[in-house]
Amino acid sequence: MKKILFLLFVLFSVKTNAQSITLILNDPDKQSPTNVRVKPGGEVVTTIDSRAELATVHVIAKEGNYFLVNSYSTCSSDEMQLKQPGYIHYSVLGIFISNYANIAMPVYASSNKSGPLEKLKISDVFVNVLDYKNDMYYVFYKKLNKKFWVESKYLCNAACTTCN
C-alpha cells in the first residue's frame, strides 16, 4: 500500500512540475501590493509588491480563476521563495504577445488546435492568462474582448527584457 501511495505521489509531482510556468505580475492597482491568498478567495497570507517594477511569478498549479505560485522575482532581485505557496487571481497575471514579425498569427478555440481558427495581427500587447496546456496558453485580450488559445512561440514572459 505504501508503494502505491508513493508511486501516486511521484506521478502527481511529475505532472505538477511539468505544468509549471512563469507569468508576469501586472497589477493595475498601484496603491497597494498584490495579495497572495491561502486558497482561492481566501485569507491573504502575504503580498508581492510590483508597483515600482514588474515582477514574474512561478506558477505551479491552477484552481478555478486562481494560479498557485511558490516564488517571484523582480528586475532588481533574484528569485524569492514564498514561505508557503499561495494563490493569485488571473486578472493580475499575464504574458506579452511578442509577435515581432508582425504576421497574422493563428489563434485557436481549443488547446489541441482544433475548432475555428482565426488569424490576428497583434504584437507587443499584454494579455491575461486564463489557462495553459500542451504548450498553448488560453488568454484574454481586453482591448478586443477576446479569449483564445495561442502557441507559446508567440509569447514572452520576460518582465525586464524583450524576447526575440
Model-derived regions: residue spans:
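Short, solvent-exposed interaction modules
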Residues: 94-133, 138
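Sec/Tat signal peptide C-region and signal peptidase I cleavage site
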Residues: 14-18
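Short alpha-helix capping/helix-loop boundary micro-motifs
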Residues: 38-45, 110-116
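SH3/SH3-like beta-barrel superfamily modules
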Residues: 46-85, 121-153
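Short N-terminal segments immediately surrounding and downstream of signal-peptide cleavage
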Residues: 19-37
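Sec-dependent N-terminal signal peptides
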Residues: 4-13
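Boundary regions of SH3-family modules and the immediately adjacent low-complexity/disordered segments
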Residues: 20-23, 68-105, 111, 140-164
